[in-house]
From Swiss-Prot:
Its EC number is 4.1.1.48. Transmembrane segments: none annotated. The lineage of its organism: Archaea, Thermoproteota, Thermoprotei, Thermoproteales, Thermoproteaceae. This is Indole-3-glycerol phosphate synthase. It comes from Pyrobaculum arsenaticum (strain DSM 13514 / JCM 11321 / PZ6). It is an enzyme of class 4 (lyase). Belongs to the TrpC family.
Length: 249
């Protein structure tokens, strides 16, 4: 069984026992506008399929520390591989707009994102396929959420770029079949899409020059997880690179 098949099976088991979502009490923010011309999306990620990233950083401390520099936060809610929790959304929300990241296969997960206060939700094209990804993206938009449709190849990216609405693409440098990371591949996809659709670049970003490269390709932002979890102070350098690039492009 490959990784994505394992993921779908695990999510199906979760959905069988998950409670109903809470009623939303937090304001809804336009995630795209929050990024400005180019923003750093700081991700709270305690673990990944490769293992533990960091467990000694409380979520509220992370959000407070990075709030002055991040345009938005990404929060992992998947509990098995990422040690995530829906409650992390509510913790992040007072500081910045929030993207919920999970293996979303059902509208009920989008309801949970909405109920806990997220402003955007990740939908992985390769996990659910074209038709289901479109359905989930449309449902998210009906709730007022920004669907960030994650792609890891040019064919899927070009298809999703035609969907219109509030859809934003998340170009993932990580191949979900092998879990290998290639920023160069992500940059090539971004170059091919330039001007067609709003997009961010995910995975593998850890250096100011990588932020600048993404910015010069007219990405709307970069999502940085592991590097900031291990060294939150790095965001100052990344933010400086972003501001410098925006002033020159």
């Amino acid at each position: 069984m490959d990784f994505l098949a394992q993921v779908k099976k695990a999510v199906e088991l979760r959905l069988a026992t998950e409670p109903s979502p809470p009623a939303r009490s937090l304001p809804l923010v336009d995630f795209s506008k929050a990024l400005g011309e180019f923003g750093i999306i700081a991700e709270y990620k305690r673990a990944s399929p490769r293992g533990v990233v960091r467990l000694d950083m409380p979520p509220w401390a992370y959000f407070a520390m990075l709030q002055p520099y991040a345009a938005a936060f990404s929060v992992l809610t998947e509990p098995y591989w990422f040690l995530g929790d829906y409650r992390f959304i509510t913790m992040a929300k007072p500081f910045k707009p929030v993207l919920m990241k999970d293996f979303v296969i059902d509208n009920r997960q989008i309801d949970m994102a909405y109920g806990y206060g997220a402003d955007a939700v990740l939908i992985i094209y390769r996990l659910v396929g074209r038709e289901k990804a479109m359905e989930l993206a449309e449902y998210a938009q009906r709730l007022g959420l920004t669907p960030v449709v994650e792609v890891d190849n040019l064919q899927d990216a070009k298809e999703a770029a035609t969907w219109g609405g509030k859809v934003m693409l998340g170009i993932n440098a990580r191949d979900l079949a092998t879990l290998e990371v290639s920023l160069q591949k992500a940059f090539e996809i971004a170059k091919a899409l330039r001007g067609d659709v709003d997009f961010i670049i995910e995975s593998g970003i850890s250096k100011p020059e990588e932020v600048e490269k993404a910015c010069m390709l007219y990405a709307r932002g970069v999502l940085v997880g592991t590097a900031l979890m291990k060294n939150p102070a790095l965001i100052k350098e990344l933010r400086h690179a972003a501001e410098s690039c925006v002033s020159r492009r």
